[in-house]
From Swiss-Prot:
It catalyses: Release of signal peptides from bacterial membrane prolipoproteins. Hydrolyzes -Xaa-Yaa-Zaa-|-(S,diacylglyceryl)Cys-, in which Xaa is hydrophobic (preferably Leu), and Yaa (Ala or Ser) and Zaa (Gly or Ala) have small, neutral side chains. It comes from the Bacteria. PANTHER family: LIPOPROTEIN SIGNAL PEPTIDASE. It is a multi-pass membrane protein. Keywords: Aspartyl protease, Cell inner membrane, Cell membrane, Hydrolase, Membrane, Protease, Transmembrane, Transmembrane helix. This is Lipoprotein signal peptidase. One of its GO terms (cellular component) is plasma membrane. Its EC number is 3.4.23.36. Belongs to the peptidase A8 family. This protein specifically catalyzes the removal of signal peptides from prolipoproteins. Its main location: membrane. Pathway: Protein modification; lipoprotein biosynthesis (signal peptide cleavage).
Protein backbone atom coordinates (compact mmCIF):
# COMPACT_ATOMS: atom_id res chain seq x y z
CA UNK A 1 0.00 0.00 0.00
CA UNK A 2 2.79 2.43 0.94
CA UNK A 3 4.73 1.94 -2.35
CA UNK A 4 1.52 2.63 -4.30
CA UNK A 5 0.81 5.81 -2.32
CA UNK A 6 4.41 6.92 -2.79
CA UNK A 7 4.14 6.35 -6.55
CA UNK A 8 0.87 8.29 -6.70
CA UNK A 9 2.41 11.17 -4.75
CA UNK A 10 5.55 11.31 -6.93
CA UNK A 11 3.48 11.14 -10.12
CA UNK A 12 1.20 13.91 -8.87
CA UNK A 13 4.14 16.10 -7.83
CA UNK A 14 6.00 15.69 -11.13
CA UNK A 15 2.97 16.00 -13.40
CA UNK A 16 1.57 18.96 -11.48
CA UNK A 17 4.61 21.08 -12.31
CA UNK A 18 4.20 20.42 -16.03
CA UNK A 19 0.41 20.69 -16.09
CA UNK A 20 0.23 23.85 -13.96
CA UNK A 21 2.94 25.52 -16.07
CA UNK A 22 1.04 24.75 -19.29
CA UNK A 23 -2.27 25.94 -17.83
CA UNK A 24 -0.68 29.21 -16.66
CA UNK A 25 0.86 29.82 -20.11
CA UNK A 26 -2.48 29.08 -21.79
CA UNK A 27 -4.54 31.27 -19.47
CA UNK A 28 -2.09 34.19 -19.59
CA UNK A 29 -2.08 34.12 -23.41
CA UNK A 30 -5.89 34.10 -23.48
CA UNK A 31 -6.13 36.87 -20.91
CA UNK A 32 -3.70 39.07 -22.86
CA UNK A 33 -5.44 38.61 -26.21
CA UNK A 34 -8.93 38.98 -24.74
CA UNK A 35 -7.86 42.26 -23.14
CA UNK A 36 -6.12 43.61 -26.25
CA UNK A 37 -8.04 42.24 -29.23
CA UNK A 38 -11.45 43.46 -28.10
CA UNK A 39 -10.35 47.02 -28.88
CA UNK A 40 -8.90 46.22 -32.29
CA UNK A 41 -10.75 47.15 -35.44
CA UNK A 42 -12.52 44.03 -36.64
CA UNK A 43 -11.34 42.21 -33.49
CA UNK A 44 -8.21 41.17 -35.37
CA UNK A 45 -4.45 41.75 -35.21
CA UNK A 46 -2.53 40.95 -38.40
CA UNK A 47 0.85 39.36 -37.62
CA UNK A 48 2.00 38.09 -41.03
CA UNK A 49 0.46 37.49 -44.44
CA UNK A 50 -0.67 34.05 -43.26
CA UNK A 51 -1.18 34.54 -39.50
CA UNK A 52 -3.74 36.66 -37.66
CA UNK A 53 -4.70 36.96 -34.01
CA UNK A 54 -8.49 37.07 -33.81
CA UNK A 55 -11.09 37.47 -31.07
CA UNK A 56 -13.22 34.31 -31.17
CA UNK A 57 -15.33 32.40 -28.66
CA UNK A 58 -15.66 28.70 -29.43
CA UNK A 59 -18.78 26.99 -28.10
CA UNK A 60 -17.82 23.66 -29.67
CA UNK A 61 -14.72 21.51 -29.19
CA UNK A 62 -11.17 22.02 -30.43
CA UNK A 63 -10.77 23.99 -33.69
CA UNK A 64 -14.40 25.10 -33.58
CA UNK A 65 -15.89 21.67 -34.26
CA UNK A 66 -19.53 21.06 -33.26
CA UNK A 67 -20.09 24.73 -32.41
CA UNK A 68 -23.57 24.54 -33.98
CA UNK A 69 -24.67 22.56 -30.89
CA UNK A 70 -23.65 25.36 -28.53
CA UNK A 71 -26.96 25.30 -26.63
CA UNK A 72 -26.09 21.81 -25.35
CA UNK A 73 -22.32 21.76 -25.71
CA UNK A 74 -21.11 23.54 -22.58
CA UNK A 75 -22.63 21.21 -19.98
CA UNK A 76 -21.96 18.11 -22.09
CA UNK A 77 -18.35 19.03 -22.82
CA UNK A 78 -17.70 20.00 -19.20
CA UNK A 79 -18.79 16.56 -18.04
CA UNK A 80 -17.17 14.53 -20.82
CA UNK A 81 -13.90 16.49 -20.75
CA UNK A 82 -13.64 16.10 -16.98
CA UNK A 83 -14.12 12.34 -17.32
CA UNK A 84 -11.51 12.22 -20.11
CA UNK A 85 -9.00 14.21 -18.04
CA UNK A 86 -9.48 11.84 -15.08
CA UNK A 87 -8.97 8.82 -17.35
CA UNK A 88 -5.86 10.36 -18.92
CA UNK A 89 -4.47 11.02 -15.45
CA UNK A 90 -5.08 7.36 -14.60
CA UNK A 91 -3.16 6.32 -17.73
CA UNK A 92 -0.36 8.73 -16.83
CA UNK A 93 -0.01 7.14 -13.39
CA UNK A 94 0.43 3.77 -15.09
CA UNK A 95 2.87 5.07 -17.71
CA UNK A 96 6.25 3.34 -17.74
CA UNK A 97 8.26 5.70 -19.97
CA UNK A 98 9.25 9.35 -19.75
CA UNK A 99 7.74 9.91 -23.20
CA UNK A 100 4.28 8.68 -22.25
CA UNK A 101 4.43 10.61 -18.97
CA UNK A 102 5.29 13.84 -20.80
CA UNK A 103 2.71 13.18 -23.53
CA UNK A 104 -0.14 12.65 -21.08
CA UNK A 105 0.98 15.74 -19.10
CA UNK A 106 0.75 17.92 -22.23
CA UNK A 107 -2.66 16.55 -23.22
CA UNK A 108 -4.01 17.01 -19.69
CA UNK A 109 -2.53 20.51 -19.43
CA UNK A 110 -4.22 21.58 -22.67
CA UNK A 111 -7.52 19.96 -21.72
CA UNK A 112 -7.54 21.62 -18.29
CA UNK A 113 -6.78 25.00 -19.88
CA UNK A 114 -9.85 24.73 -22.10
CA UNK A 115 -11.93 23.33 -19.23
CA UNK A 116 -11.20 26.46 -17.18
CA UNK A 117 -12.50 28.61 -20.05
CA UNK A 118 -15.64 26.56 -20.41
CA UNK A 119 -16.33 26.53 -16.67
CA UNK A 120 -15.80 30.24 -15.98
CA UNK A 121 -16.69 31.80 -19.35
CA UNK A 122 -19.12 29.33 -20.88
CA UNK A 123 -16.95 28.93 -24.00
CA UNK A 124 -13.32 28.49 -25.03
CA UNK A 125 -11.40 31.52 -26.26
CA UNK A 126 -9.54 30.91 -29.56
CA UNK A 127 -7.25 33.45 -31.18
CA UNK A 128 -4.65 31.84 -33.49
CA UNK A 129 -5.73 31.87 -37.14
CA UNK A 130 -3.58 30.53 -39.99
CA UNK A 131 -4.69 31.12 -43.57
CA UNK A 132 -3.21 30.89 -47.04
CA UNK A 133 -4.88 32.27 -50.15
CA UNK A 134 -8.38 30.74 -50.15
CA UNK A 135 -7.64 28.22 -47.39
CA UNK A 136 -8.48 29.12 -43.80
CA UNK A 137 -7.42 26.83 -40.94
CA UNK A 138 -9.83 26.62 -37.96
CA UNK A 139 -9.03 29.11 -35.19
CA UNK A 140 -7.34 27.55 -32.16
CA UNK A 141 -5.39 28.42 -29.00
CA UNK A 142 -2.27 27.34 -27.12
CA UNK A 143 -4.19 24.69 -25.16
CA UNK A 144 -5.06 23.00 -28.47
CA UNK A 145 -1.36 23.16 -29.40
CA UNK A 146 -0.41 21.47 -26.12
CA UNK A 147 -2.92 18.68 -26.79
CA UNK A 148 -1.51 18.10 -30.29
CA UNK A 149 2.08 18.12 -28.98
CA UNK A 150 1.08 15.60 -26.31
CA UNK A 151 -0.55 13.29 -28.86
CA UNK A 152 2.55 13.47 -31.10
CA UNK A 153 4.78 12.60 -28.12
CA UNK A 154 2.53 9.66 -27.22
CA UNK A 155 2.56 8.31 -30.79
CA UNK A 156 6.34 8.65 -31.04
CA UNK A 157 6.78 6.99 -27.64
CA UNK A 158 4.47 4.13 -28.64
CA UNK A 159 6.46 3.27 -31.77
CA UNK A 160 9.83 3.77 -30.04
CA UNK A 161 8.80 1.44 -27.21
CA UNK A 162 7.39 -1.08 -29.70
CA UNK A 163 10.70 -1.07 -31.59
CA UNK A 164 12.71 -1.67 -28.41
CA UNK A 165 10.43 -4.55 -27.40
CA UNK A 166 10.69 -6.14 -30.86
CA UNK A 167 14.49 -5.83 -30.86
CA UNK A 168 14.69 -7.31 -27.38
CA UNK A 169 12.40 -10.18 -28.40
CA UNK A 170 14.55 -10.79 -31.50
CA UNK A 171 17.67 -10.82 -29.33
CA UNK A 172 16.10 -13.35 -26.96
CA UNK A 173 15.06 -15.47 -29.95
CA UNK A 174 18.62 -15.42 -31.37
CA UNK A 175 20.05 -16.43 -27.98
CA UNK A 176 17.53 -19.26 -27.76
CA UNK A 177 18.58 -20.45 -31.24
CA UNK A 178 22.26 -20.46 -30.22
CA UNK A 179 21.49 -22.41 -27.05
CA UNK A 180 19.44 -24.95 -29.01
CA UNK A 181 22.21 -25.42 -31.56
CA UNK A 182 24.80 -25.73 -28.79
CA UNK A 183 22.73 -28.36 -27.05
CA UNK A 184 22.37 -30.28 -30.31
CA UNK A 185 26.13 -30.20 -30.85
CA UNK A 186 26.76 -31.46 -27.32
CA UNK A 187 24.47 -34.40 -27.94
CA UNK A 188 25.87 -35.35 -31.35
CA UNK A 189 29.53 -34.35 -31.32
CA UNK A 190 32.13 -35.17 -28.68
CA UNK A 191 34.29 -32.34 -29.91
CA UNK A 192 31.45 -29.88 -29.72
CA UNK A 193 33.05 -27.52 -27.22
CA UNK A 194 35.04 -25.72 -29.93
CA UNK A 195 31.96 -25.34 -32.12
CA UNK A 196 29.94 -24.04 -29.18
CA UNK A 197 32.60 -21.44 -28.47
CA UNK A 198 32.55 -20.33 -32.11
CA UNK A 199 28.76 -19.98 -31.98
CA UNK A 200 28.89 -17.85 -28.85
CA UNK A 201 31.57 -15.61 -30.38
Amino acid sequence: MLPLLKKLYLTFARSSRIIITLVIIDQLSKWWFIDNLRWKSGLMLKVTSFLNMVYTWNYGISFGLMREYYQYSNAIFLITNTIIVCYLYYLMIRSKTIGSFAGYSFVIGGAVGNLIDRFFRGAVFDFIHFHYQNYSFPVFNLADCFIIIGVIILIEDYYSTKKVIEEKAKGNYDNAQIEAMAEKIRNTDKGGNDKIASLQN
